[in-house]
């Protein structure tokens, strides 16, 4: 699943480690999300959306819907 996580994180001026600490996950989880190697749980998706003050759909895009 494609996402804008890295873009949003950089816009907010925080590192992967800082975001991981805020969300109580590992830095590796954030890296895997940013590189499309991991799909988040619904709870983590909501935490990310709440932190960045956007909707889940503004972070995560379903490539199948774009076709």
Give the label of every model feature segment.
Residues 3-22:
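Short basic helix-loop element that most often maps to the first helix and adjoining turn
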